[in-house]
Amino acid sequence: MSPIRISAISYLNSLPFAWCLEHSAIMDKIDLSYDIPSQCADKLLSGEADIGLIPIVETLRMPEHYIISDLCIGADKAVRTVVLASETPLANISTIYLDSHSRTSVALARVLAQHFWKIEPEWIHFSGDITKYPRSGNSAAVVIGDKAFGMQSPYVYDLAVEWREFTGLPFVFACWVANQPIDKEFINRFNRTLNGLFDNINAIAEHYSDQTPAGVDLLDYWTNNISYPLTADKREGLKLFLQYATHVVH
């Protein structure tokens, strides 16, 4: 039997998943690769991967998809690593530069701009280092991932907090998704493996301590910012977001 090809996210928020997979017997059954979120989705869409930890908005592009895990990359409150960095208060923003690494975060910013912030900025896809976006008086940028830590801008808006204030619900950034039905026995093993993060979170933080940006407490980030269980509230938030996102995804 061919190994199941899994594409996982290469950010700090998903390192607990990586550790659990790499320290389990399931490694004999899988071909594991690490990518930025948008590449995880592209691999799943092209058939280069069977399972991916993908930005949830990508499911709108998939003719067939299955959420196969009760774990996700989510946030009940501030997530810290998905932000709108701005030179001006929200009401004055005229241009927003977009990070290409995750289409979910871009879609979330568009939803919030239209329905919550009530602004109509110009949206510009930025191919370079998003932390170096053109800083004019009324510009802003969607910044995601590890580079969002310590983002230096006059105004930094956490998009998970903004979504919570808008809807009263938590937000789901990424889920484990398959592009075809997967053997149930494998899915059960896969989920048991991933759930090992809760019992091993301290050891995982120690394991990756040398990969941590200065000033970042991994354990605090994983326990107080990232929320891994895909709860009923998160599923409700996910469903609502996809309803909004259908109208802003291009």
Predicted regions and their residues:
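Pocket-lining segment of extracytoplasmic ligand-binding domains
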Residues: 125-207
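Ligand-binding cleft/hinge of the Venus flytrap
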Residues: 16-28, 106-125, 206
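An extracytoplasmic/periplasmic, membrane-proximal ligand-sensing/linker region
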Residues: 147-148, 204-250
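Short, glycine-/small- and polar/acidic-enriched structural segments
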Residues: 12-92, 100-101
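Short beta-strand->loop
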Residues: 4-10, 94-104, 109
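Immediate post-signal peptide segment of exported/extracytoplasmic ligand-binding proteins
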Residues: 1-5, 89-94, 247-248
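A bilobed periplasmic-binding-protein/Venus flytrap-type ligand-binding module shared by bacterial periplasmic
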Residues: 20, 82-90, 95, 171-185
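Short helix-initiation/N-cap motifs at beta->coil->alpha
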Residues: 31-42, 120-137
